[in-house]
Amino acid sequence: MNAVIHGMREGALTLAYCAIVTARDRARRLANPTTLGVRAVVTRDGRLLMVRHRSGATPWSLPGGGVSRGEDLAAAALREVREEGGCVVQVERLLGMYFQGDHGFNNYVAVFVCAATGDARPPVGDLEIVDARFFLPQDVPATADVGSLRRIAEFRRGLVGLAEMW
């Protein structure tokens, strides 16, 4: 019975999360058609940190999010990794700046390469992130978002200073 209740709760949370994210994204696009975000390629012992979002066609991604007004890009990356992945990291370098634009909305993303100083601890009871873990590069989920998969491939090839489409 507990499994049924848990499943119903998770389903309700997923529906609520989808509605909130959709409404938030639409409001953001109207209020501010240009955004700035960060992502992080986080490594530890040859593994890569991925976080799983509650919903979406591609729920696994590199940790990251929006940059707050007046916030330093590297500080935003550190904060996002701590919030989504539950681990402390050190920024090693900037991998590149990326652009994603569609339907009048422009999103710029700075991607940093970081080294983790501890294990991932996914947030408990979080509405957005339901899992965070380190994967060997060949085991990164194929359902990860395409932009994250591209950034991982660029990182593995040793590329730096990129300016590409997300």
Language-model region placement:
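Conserved Nudix-box catalytic region and its N-terminal flanking loop in Nudix hydrolases
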Residues: 43-83
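Residues that recognize and position ribonucleotide moieties
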Residues: 34, 41, 60, 87, ...
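Residues embedded in well-ordered beta-strands
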Residues: 39-41, 47-49, 111-113, 133
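Residue-level preference for beta-strand/loop junctions
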Residues: 34, 58, 106-108
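Unchanged
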Residues: 67-90, 98-155, 165-166
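Acidic, metal-coordinating catalytic segment for phosphate/diphosphate chemistry
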Residues: 2-39
